[in-house]
């Protein structure tokens, strides 16, 4: 899914959507006042997702692993629910094949 324009900008709107969703969740997590035991795990995995979105190089297993770790760390925090849902939806969109299915 590595689609790039000149200047390094990612051309695929799904990848841009992932980057925007991850940025929103990172911002909301940064200002969330509660002490979260797995905050560092969530922050690390959000950084991984952000890096993949910036590069446009999306590894499906890694995307899903990071999403699971973030959801496990933050899933019980209702204030972050909408932003987390946006990240999940963006990961799902990035995982959808637009071309012919492989291996089947």
Residue ranges and their predicted role:
Residues 77-80, 84-90:
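Mature extracytoplasmic or organellar-lumen-exposed domains after removal of signal/transit peptides
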């Amino acid at each position: 899914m590595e689609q790039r324009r000149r200047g390094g900008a990612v051309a695929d709107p799904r990848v841009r959507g992932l980057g925007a969703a991850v940025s929103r969740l990172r911002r909301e997590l940064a200002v969330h006042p509660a002490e979260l035991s797995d905050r560092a795990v969530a922050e690390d995995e959000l950084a991984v997702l952000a890096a993949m979105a910036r590069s446009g190089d999306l590894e499906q297993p890694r995307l899903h692993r990071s999403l699971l770790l973030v959801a496990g760390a933050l899933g019980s925090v209702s204030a972050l629910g909408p932003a987390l849902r946006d990240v999940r939806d963006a990961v799902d969109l990035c995982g959808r094949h637009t071309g012919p299915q492989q291996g089947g």
